[in-house]
């Protein structure tokens, strides 16, 4: 896949994630407002609640998932063999964003369970990405706010 196609697919996956986030966010915000919360306070609470308690699909590229999962599984095997390995994932140049790293570790853990049951890595990744739900939204509250109100891209949650 060339770079342009990759960027387009990434944008589409982000849009799907954002759509899923916004649907859950608006339902949560309505519930908080019905309870008489101040709009500003309800917005912050709805963002934090949706991020922590939403169970979205994994909106990631299959090729990228394959590379990241194989990378993590190989580093796990090296650690188990006692061979020299890097101290942590960041040392090898893996995802530096904490939330993104947590997402990849979660996907890898699910793939690992399926491969132990006899599925190939490719089929396990396909199954996880198509049928499993994430434990949370792997975005920060600040990023979530930019999805809710695009005009607030320069403002953080207050």
Please tell me what each predicted stretch does.
Residues 143-158:
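C-terminal engagement modules used by replication, chromatin/transcription, nuclear envelope/ESCRT
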Residues 1-122, 139:
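Low-complexity, PEST-like segments
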Residues 50, 124-133:
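Short alpha-helical "recognition helix" segments of helix-turn-helix
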């Amino acid at each position: 896949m060339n770079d342009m196609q990759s960027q387009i697919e990434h944008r589409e996956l982000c849009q799907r994630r954002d759509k899923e986030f916004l649907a859950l966010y608006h339902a949560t915000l309505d519930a908080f407002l019905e309870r008489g919360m101040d709009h500003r306070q309800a917005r912050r609470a709805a963002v934090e609640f949706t991020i922590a308690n939403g169970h979205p699909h994994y909106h990631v590229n299959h090729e990228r998932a394959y590379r990241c999962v194989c990378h993590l599984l190989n580093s796990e095997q090296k650690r188990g063999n006692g061979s020299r390995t890097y101290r942590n994932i960041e040392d090898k140049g893996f995802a530096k964003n904490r939330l993104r790293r947590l997402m990849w570790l979660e996907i890898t853990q699910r793939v690992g369970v399926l491969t132990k049951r006899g599925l190939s890595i490719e089929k396990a990744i396909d199954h996880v990405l198509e049928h499993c739900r994430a434990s949370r939204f792997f975005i920060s509250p600040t990023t979530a706010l930019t999805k809710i109100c695009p005009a607030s891209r320069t403002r953080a949650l207050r």
